[in-house]
């Protein structure tokens, strides 16, 4: 639907329980043409614990490689410790922290930035 985005869905028994998006760089951004942004990786709370997030992440990496990208970038709230553990276990490197990344229920939350070089 949107040329700059790729949607990856995770299913169990034919039902969609999670998804992620790959956002390609804009066409006029030649300097970043080798990198794609992973966004909105989500698994429904009642479907967690079955490895679906890892499967979606790996499918996103596979699709990024197929599209010719060499790097995946992502960012995540510091409070999302399960997601951070997944990214680190899958080889993503944290390269920075934003001290005022998000506001959740009136609280300021830090955010972390990660990247992974695709082989």
Identify what each model region corresponds to.
Residues 49, 62-66, 93:
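Conserved amphipathic alpha-helical interaction elements at protein-protein interfaces in regulatory
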Residues 57, 64-75:
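Conserved GNAT acetyl-CoA-binding A-motif
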Residues 1-46, 57-59, 63, 100, ...:
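Acetyl-CoA-dependent GNAT
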């Amino acid at each position: 639907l949107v040329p700059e985005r790729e949607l990856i869905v995770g299913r169990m028994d034919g039902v969609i329980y999670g998804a992620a998006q790959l956002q390609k760089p804009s066409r006029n951004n030649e300097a970043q043409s080798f990198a794609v942004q992973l966004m909105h990786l989500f698994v429904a709370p009642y479907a967690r614990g079955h490895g679906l997030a890892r499967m979606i992440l790996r499918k996103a990496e596979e699709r990024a490689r197929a599209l010719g990208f060499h790097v995946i970038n992502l960012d995540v709230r510091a409070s999302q410790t399960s997601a951070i553990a997944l990214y680190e276990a899958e080889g993503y490197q944290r390269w920075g922290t934003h001290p005022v990344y998000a506001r959740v229920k009136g609280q300021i939350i830090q955010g972390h930035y990660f990247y992974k070089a695709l082989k």
